[in-house]
Amino acid sequence: MDTGGQHWGKVIWHAYEHLQVPVSETDFRDAYVHAERTLGKNPIIQPDFTFYKTLETKIRLQLEYLQTSYITPLTSYILPLTSHLYEATVAETSKSREVLLSLKKQYPMVLVSNFYGNIATVLKEFKLDGIFDTIIESAVVGVRKPDPQIFTLGVEALGMQPDEVVVVGDSMDKDIIPASKAGCHTVWFKGEGWTNDPVDESPAGKVITDLTQLLVNSE
């Protein structure tokens, strides 16, 4: 919905490359994991944080972590990276919004997300509020992907049976496999992954590479 099917880590790394941040990809990956774990364990992101502020917080944590291993000052890249990534996210979510609005005319929809408790603020920021009938947010419900239970909560919110529900996700491990275990049909939004290792596509009911393909499949 916000990255065109790409893993967020790869999206951020490509921004580092674009802005020529002088760090190695190996070190960046360590910093990315550090920042995600830090945010997952500590209530740093508040309910009123916009996506811009959330993104800036992530980038700051990454660069502060990297700074311990590099002599070159890195914090000057915080704002350029945040602005570059935010601009790309605005463009991507704008395209996704049109697809979601079309789907909403035909189907009830629930958003299931591993997020920090500020998803309502972020959806409003990107004019995506009101599209989903219910939001299942990990920080609120206390269950995270890849636990199939979080998808079961989504099914229950719809008041439907699992085999009546289609889950669309960009992660094979965190979306498609657990959603299948929950009994749902699945569509894998395939994009650039966190690693370059080949991924077995067989667990997915369907595979798409562009969100607009959902409109064709829904006809």
Describe the residue ranges of each PLM region.
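N-terminal helical cap/lid subdomain that shapes the substrate entry/recognition surface
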Residues: 1-97, 105
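Asp-based, Mg2+/Mn2+-dependent phosphohydrolase catalytic module
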Residues: 3, 26, 68-77, 97, ...
